[in-house]
């Protein structure tokens, strides 16, 4: 069984749950350079050579954390739907960030090697393309919503507003 760390990352903080051997650890860190350094020190204190860090691809808050630790460890960024399906299969409904981090660590620990794809830090050009693609998707979604509101408008004055 692999040694795993699950991270639940938000804008300001991230929760970490580590499963090393038979021991479990959990902690919360600020999502900034100081927090990354504190978390890095905590990982080093575990004395584990072969550590796998897993997190969900939610928003863009995970990117800096993933890229930083991919330099030193095996880092996996997982589709949130996979974690959700994993939770359903284990009849778990998490309510807190700490529980989410533990669930992600459990997934990382039990997933088949073929289900985990190592994080490779994107180039600046790839980041730019990702941002443009996300912006395009957002604009497309907003246009569709605007068309739906216009179509649903009951009177002529309301239709003019859209």
Task: Describe each PLM feature range.
Residues 1-162:
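Phosphate- and other anionic-substrate recognition elements at nucleic-acid/protein interfaces
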